[in-house]
Curated annotation (Swiss-Prot):
Signal peptide: none annotated. It comes from Bacillus subtilis (strain 168). The keyword Metal-binding applies. The keyword Lyase applies. This is Uncharacterized protein YwbC.
Length: 126
């Protein structure tokens, strides 16, 4: 069962400039930075302290087509059993964006479904 909102993914053009902004202007700390398994997408997770708060995920390389106001890519719900969430979504006939659960190099696992208005919802396991 999903436990809380884990992070919000924001698509960015320049991940280094965005990290600097979130650190220097907003006072956030870089918690993790990885290259996706596809070798193209760069991800950075930022938060305020070492507590279990909702984080910001910066995403570079997903799409070069960003509107001037930026783009929220998805919301992520934290789970401690990603396989059970996947099975539940299948049983509920959810529209899947991912055909399988993806495991990132740092061990994080995720998959996406669409909400009723096309919004992307990620189930995420740390």
């Amino acid at each position: 069962m999903a436990k809380r909102i884990d992070h919000t993914g924001i698509m960015v053009r320049d991940i280094n400039a965005s990290i600097t902004f979130y650190e220097e202007v907003l006072g956030m700390k870089l918690k993790d930075r990885i290259t996706h398994t596809n070798g193209v997408i760069e991800l950075a997770f930022l938060g305020f302290e070492d507590g279990p708060e909702t984080e910001i995920e910066l995403i570079q390389g997903y799409s070069s087509e960003l509107p001037a106001e930026g783009k929220v890519h998805h919301i992520a719900l934290l789970t401690d059993d990603i396989a059970a969430e996947y099975t539940k979504a299948e049983k509920m006939n959810a529209k899947f964006i991912d055909e399988e659960i993806t495991t990132l190099p740092n061990g994080y696992r995720y998959f996406y479904i669409e909400g009723p208005d096309g919004e992307w919802i990620e189930f995420f396991q740390r």
